[in-house]
């Protein structure tokens, strides 16, 4: 996996502005209405969840062009890059699809750079191509998988870098490239560039492994809320559906040959319905 340098990325976008990355029908909001979320504006309440499609800048840009405005960025953890023992590509689809992905296939610093590049590119594109409000989209970071890892220096630097990217080398590189290429834009000047917010994300989605104890999830959420000051989502694992329900659904759909036991269902969070 090879990230595209920001200058090359922007040159590509400016050349292919009518069909960037092969997207021939570029979305533009027809209304000036928006939602308010985390004290930010959101033009459209939809977008990609964390996955392989939100780990490279060009994937995020393509999703924006197709209409996405809320982006759950690919999850990061302390185990990253070549140290991550997962077969690539992460998703194998033949008849049924086996999703063996974990966290980002990049290193954590590389992931941070990709998200900053994507943010800056969208700020330029939305203004230059009149694709909607430059502040009409939201980036939501995603971290995992235990408190020790999330509190590590590596993940802390990632979180702080997205809370405010102004001190990162890639942010300054994006600014300098844009300043030196103002002639390539019709509707962007230096005043606009200096007004681009370096506060990329004020929210986080917590991703935990199957079997993570409820009290560990609570400790992580408390840390993210109180110590990091982030609006926090907790991602619910599909084992909450229960073994019997999951087994029945798969059998009914013709996947009765898929084999799995009750282990993760029994040791993961349990869903209890309270009738009032």
Residue ranges and their predicted role:
Residues 1-227:
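N-terminal capping/small domains of soluble enzymes
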Residues 187-201, 205, 246-266:
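A solvent-exposed, charged loop/short amphipathic helix patch at secondary-structure junctions
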Residues 83-85, 244-248:
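Short acidic, glycine/serine/threonine-rich loops at helix termini
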Residues 212-218, 240-245, 272:
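Active-site-adjacent beta->alpha loops and helix N-cap segments on the catalytic face
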């Amino acid at each position: 996996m090879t990230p595209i340098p920001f200058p090359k990325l922007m040159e590509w976008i400016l050349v292919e502005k009518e069909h960037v990355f092969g997207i021939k029908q570029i979305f533009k909001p027809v209304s000036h209405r928006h939602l308010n979320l985390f004290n930010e504006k959101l033009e459209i309440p939809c977008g990609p969840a964390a996955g392989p499609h939100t780990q490279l800048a060009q994937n995020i840009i393509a999703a924006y062009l197709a209409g996405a405005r809320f982006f759950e960025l690919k999850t990061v953890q302390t185990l990253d890059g070549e140290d991550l023992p997962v077969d690539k590509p992460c998703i194998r689809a033949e008849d049924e699809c086996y999703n063996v992905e974990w966290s980002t296939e990049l290193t954590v610093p590389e992931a941070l750079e990709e998200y900053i590049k994507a943010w800056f590119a969208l700020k330029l594109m939305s203004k230059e191509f009149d694709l909607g409000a430059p502040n009409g989209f939201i980036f939501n970071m995603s971290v995992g998988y235990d408190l020790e890892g999330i509190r590590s220096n590596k993940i802390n630097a990632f979180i702080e870098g997205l809370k405010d990217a102004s001190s990162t080398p890639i942010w300054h590189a994006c600014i300098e490239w844009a300043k030196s290429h103002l002639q390539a834009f019709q509707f962007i000047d230096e005043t606009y560039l200096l007004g681009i917010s370096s506060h990329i994300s004020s929210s986080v989605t917590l991703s935990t492994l199957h079997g993570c104890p409820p009290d560990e999830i609570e400790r992580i959420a408390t840390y993210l809320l109180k110590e990091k000051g982030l609006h926090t989502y907790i991602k619910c694992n599909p084992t909450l559906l229960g073994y019997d329900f999951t087994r029945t659904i798969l059998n009914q759909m013709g996947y009765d040959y898929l084999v799995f036991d009750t282990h993760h269902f029994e040791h993961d969070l349990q869903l209890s319905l309270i009738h009032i």
